[in-house]
Amino acid sequence: MPVQKFLKTFLWLVAIHSCLVGIFLIILPESWLAFFGYIGYRRSFFQVQGGVFHLVLAITYLWAARNPLRDQSLVIITICAKGIATFFLLLYYLLIEPIWIVLLSALGDFLMGSIILILFINLKKQNQPAKEVS
């Protein structure tokens, strides 16, 4: 599978993941929060806001997936979003509250961002004009 097609497909999968996480955050009943490690946590505006933010990111990922070579800035935003999410989630897990789903989310964002970065670098290498040999 060519690199661009693989990157497009992977960005679609990341967008679907983000959309599902967003919807899940918005509709998750308060009674389920303890299962995910949020003991004593009460549903709040910020939970729903996080869900809406995931939906916004999903749109960005879908736009990046349309043509990653033409819309390189959207791919870079995607990589940055995954890097920032990884950093934030790891810090939260290590310094604030060791919630297992937060650590799992950090690892997932790191993996997704790393794969996108590797594919993007390979796509750019593959599409560089050949250098003339004199």
What are these regions (language model features)?
Residues Q4-S44:
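Membrane-helix boundary elements
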Residues C19-F24, S44-A65, I77-G83, F87:
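Core segments of alpha-helical transmembrane spans in multipass integral membrane proteins
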Residues I26, L62, L90, S114-L117:
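Membrane-embedded alpha-helical segments of multi-pass transporters/permeases
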Residues L28-P29, G37-Y38, P68, Y93-E97, ...:
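Short helix-capping/hinge motifs at transmembrane helix termini and TM-loop junctions
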Residues F35-F45, S73-I77, P98-G108:
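Non-cytosolic membrane-interface motifs at loop->transmembrane helix junctions
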Residues R66-L69, F87-L104:
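Membrane-helix boundary connector in multi-pass membrane proteins
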Residues V75-L89, S105-I116:
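Hydrophobic alpha-helical segments of small multi-pass membrane proteins
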Residues L111-S134:
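Membrane-water interface at the C-terminal end of transmembrane alpha helices
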